[in-house]
Curated annotation (Swiss-Prot):
GO terms for cellular component: DNA-directed RNA polymerase complex. It catalyses: RNA(n) + a ribonucleoside 5'-triphosphate = RNA(n+1) + diphosphate. Pfam families: RNA_pol_Rpb2_1, RNA_pol_Rpb2_2, RNA_pol_Rpb2_3, RNA_pol_Rpb2_45, RNA_pol_Rpb2_6, RNA_pol_Rpb2_7. PROSITE patterns: RNA_POL_BETA (PS01166). It comes from the Bacteria. Keywords: DNA-directed RNA polymerase, Nucleotidyltransferase, Transcription, Transferase. This is DNA-directed RNA polymerase subunit beta. Its EC number is 2.7.7.6. The lineage of its organism: Bacteria, Pseudomonadati, Pseudomonadota, Alphaproteobacteria, Hyphomicrobiales.
Amino acid sequence: MAQTFTGRKRIRKFFGKIKEVAEMPNLIEVQKASYDQFLQIEEPKGGRDDDGLQAVFKSVFPISDFSGASMLEFVRYEFEPPKYDVDECRQRGMTFAAPLKVTLRLIVFDVDPETGAKSVKDIKEQDVYTGDIPLMTMNGTFIVNGTERVIVSQMHRSPGVFFDHDKGKTHSSGKLLFAARIIPYRGSWLDIEFDAKDIVFARIDRRRKIPVTSLLYALGLDNEEILSTFYEKIPFTREKGGWRMPFDPKRMKGYKAVADLIDADTGEVVLEAGKKLTVRAGRQLAEKGLKALKISDEEMIGQYIAEDLVDLTSGEIHAEAGEEITEKTLKLLEETGYNEIPVLDIDHVNTGAYIRNTLTADKNVTREDALFDIYRVMRPGEPPTLDSAQAMFHSLFFDSERYDLSAVGRVKMNMRLDLDCPDTVRVLRRDDILSVIRTLVELRDGKGEIDDIDHLGNRRVRSVGELMENQYRVGLLRMERAIKERMSSVDIDTVMPQDLINAKPVAAAVREFFGSSQLSQFMDQTNPLSEITHKRRLSALGPGGLTRERAGFEVRDVHPTHYGRICPIETPEGPNIGLINSLATFARVNKYGFIEAPYRRVVDSKVTDEVVYLSAMEEGKYYVAQANIPLDKDGRFEEDLIVCRHAGDVLLVAPDRVDFMDVSPKQLVSVAAALIPFLENDDANRALMGSNMQRQAVPLVRSQAPLVGTGMEAVVARDSGAAIAARRTGVIDQVDATRIVIRATEEADPSKSGVDIYRLMKFQRSNQSTCINQRPLVRVGDQVKKGDIIADGPSTELGELALGRNVLVAFMPWNGYNFEDSILLSENIAKEDVFTSIHIEEFEAMARDTKLGPEEITRDIPNVSEEALKNLDEAGIVYIGAEVRAGDILVGKITPKGESPMTPEEKLLRAIFGEKAADVRDTSLRLPPGTTGTIVEVRVFNRHGVDKDERALAIEREEIERLAKDRDDEQAILDRNVYGRLIEILDGKTAIAGPKGFRKETVVTREILTEYPRSQWWLFAVADDAIMAELEAIRAQYDDSKKRLEQRFLDKVEKLQRGDELPPGVMKMVKVFVAVKRKIQPGDKMAGRHGNKGVVSRIVPVEDMPFLEDGTNVDIVLNPLGVPSRMNVGQILETHLGWACAGLGRQVAAAMEAYYGKQDLKPLRDRLETIYGKDEIEQLKDGELPELGENLRKGVPMATPVFDGAHEADIEQQLEKAGLDASGQSTLYDGRTGEPFDRKVTVGYIYMLKLHHLVDDKIHARSIGPYSLVTQQPLGGKAQFGGQRFGEMEVWALEAYGAAYTLQEMLTVKSDDVAGRTKVYEAIVRGEDTFESGIPESFNVLVKEMRSLGLNVDLENS
């Protein structure tokens, strides 16, 4: 536990009892693995896998022209390095992407006009640029136009075949109508369904239905083949007085005898009329030797003939296959001498006559008719020809260009239909369609089960890579059409591949996907947890998915297969509930896109440490025990009956039947839910709110990790990328607020730099305007291992997620101020900036080139006082550090005005001063209302070729200095490493040559070396060739590293000095970042982790707050009535355990005081050992204990993992250890009277978050502002600086009070009476208090509208 660099500084006491054998996978692996598989950036030796981009190119190429005289082949692709790195893209508003270069080969053929034989005439190969492909950042996001976006994974129905019924809803009788649907990955859907009359129909792409036999005719089957495919034949032989039928007990089980059943050989009655033939009786009769039964003519009537009965001499058909036998038929057959008739095995009990009835009902009788019918359904209005109908039918299901089941679809189909077909066959086969129809008919006969479409074996995940692959294929197919046309229109002998390719459609498809797809979302960057959750989200919405309106209850519901795969708790409240889910903590997505959960294998009742990942389909076959089943020390089950999950049910089974066991109790829930301590004590609805609200917690100025955590905090901080982890093991060389330099000590590869420089983000703006700020945790000389946390980010503390603060809470009412979930706070909280957060707002000003002339960014603004310009520099841009308020100028800008006719005075001025006086207007960027803050950053962007102003040059110089310092530091460490290595090699060796003044054959020592400048050390030579070769290698490596370092520096400087790519018409752009400090205030929303949310109602002076016996004031008072009805008792347990944490912290603080007094570490070590146990503390060195003690003063942090955490007894034990009352309650005194309250009160530490719903962002008041163009009424909404709507009901209220004048004002001068508004202003200026109301503009609009309808309305004076 405590072996990491930060883990040793503050150890969490862990309550979990279950050993975790599997490491939790990286939390953003879903995104990274999928996109890496799509790109396959590095080409391996044997070539790339047929996956992702490679698969797309292979499926579209080769492209041949229409005549077949030339062909364009795909050879390979490679990525060039991206033009800008991640930070540059963020700042410049660019997309972080790499150019894709594809090598194409154009082959031109000579075609012999007579034979049509082809011979290669010419082959040309060329690299062609085919647009940029966005790259994923280290944290699993994309940067598109300067903003971070996430591609959410989509859950959709897996390709394959599904059997279902309508649940009796279609027909009034409630009859179940069965249906099968074959869903491909790409191509036409095929539905096969029963109607109410039990006729089987097929539908293609949900169009008009056709009898399924027409589909079978189109597949090349005839009547007889269709019947023989779906039915067995029974040969009936004529005998004296009836017919002989072979006896088959399996076939005849459940047969109810209409007449006596008679043995054909002996004449005995084997079953009396009216009785049923049971399975047992049938088997006994067969054993007794019953071979055949005698059947009367009456019983033959109603059977169906299995084959065409044809007179071989004349060719006359006496009876057709499928024809029902009647008395007439029997007579005819008797006359024509048929003694043996093959009959279809249809008994209407076990086997129904559905296919035979469909044949009879089908109007089509030949393949041609069927093909024409299908053609008319698919392309109504077009006259069919046999060739076109055949080609169209083939292209529907059997053409790999148009139809793709995908490997997943084929695997699913094989499993469902018990077929054995390789997953490379991705089109339908005849056997597939026949198997589907056969299975459907069996379902109608009562054999088999329908599928559950909400089972996770039938739903799969499309991650980034796959979504991008589909989009890229769309772009390439658009390009293919253009290439084909161009190949036939140009002189193919002279063109190169480059001339045929236009990469625009591909680039547009990619851009469209990242810019406007429903699954490409603006990343929720409120805090690290919200980032991680966003990347692990699964959405059922989006293209090809469900829509909110159509999704029913079943799709949204929790399914047994969600266990360990999808979190049953975390989903949004509202219309998207259940459609947007979160991946469970240990879940992963396999190569087919199915979600897998990990399990420990159980062998002979012994649980092993082998971890197996199972998909939902595989898991259904096994018995799976839960993670909290008690085991003995050998890993065997202690109990005789084990609770197991099997095929969606929960059962009790013997230990020897258990196959697998859960890996961890928290594999059930998502990351956010796994961060809630005592989750098992909360109601699910509140847990849902708790996990959703943690994502809205604003990063605080000084956040704290929770005293009561779950052990997941460090994992989230590490995987989110908010905290910086060391890339390599090494020693800290330099640290300051903006960067950390680490000298790598274990780098074996000499070609890699021995230095890692980590740039820390300082006061950067996130997507949600929260503040991203990183702080170093290391000091110079510290040794860190790979993966250790070296800097905290937003909402992290000592490498652990810290979304809020631990505050002292009392659960009690307080003068009604915590009525209905309101929260009462102490003034201390506001004063000490406990819940203060910094928000960074971004404002931008653009200087455009207008028709009247260019706009200008300047300090010289007309009609503006010097006072208003006090924060601007000479370039007209605000200083960094300036305090600004609403209305202050951030960037001075003037825009040319249209030429207006000049007055004689202006002409005179122009003649005297020779300049335009004031033909510009002020369009400066001002701070909007409701904002005050400090300028933290200014960025200036200039178009290429535009002269940079002083401010832009100053920013550029500063940036170059920063880059130069990085280069110099890296160079210094490189020098130190290389020359240190030289000293080690040369020290003690005899030199045969050296610099000027050095005597040969002298032993080189460190002292001698220090007499010469370092650059001359290379001149020393020794006799040993091996050493000289090593020196040469080091020298070459050193020179190469220096050159690379310098080149990197020059490239970056060149990028800086080069102009920026700005939108068309923009000459210059200035971005200003304002940091706004938001203290907590009444109206802000706060919440705990258990769904206990509320709004701050009042901030009370410290002296009025309730206080404990030692005089400590509580920080926050919550209403106890908010707990019982909500059933989120977890918050009370957290409070008790938090109280114990703080008590133990006070004990550690006392031990620390003793250490500072006597320098004796023993009391501290003893105290820590009683808290954590000996094993944990023994690993720590003496030097590490004081720092640990200091970090524990405020409280000893504890981890209580979900479903495996502290129990009531554990909490009581900790309270007793801390010397506190085991009830967790304390006597509180009223701050206003000093009297104790009548009863003891639950007091403790609870973790509270400040949420992103801040009152400052919501409250708003309008003075004078913009009006709507047509109605002249004030606009609405805070963003438009709008007014409050005085609506219908408000008008009723004034009418009810008879406030006539107020009402008239509201409807006229305070709204849209334009002339009246001006008159009111004038009257106020003159000091009068009377004015007249005119006609509201909206009335004029109504009049105009009526006139437009031809009704003339005139207003008469009355």
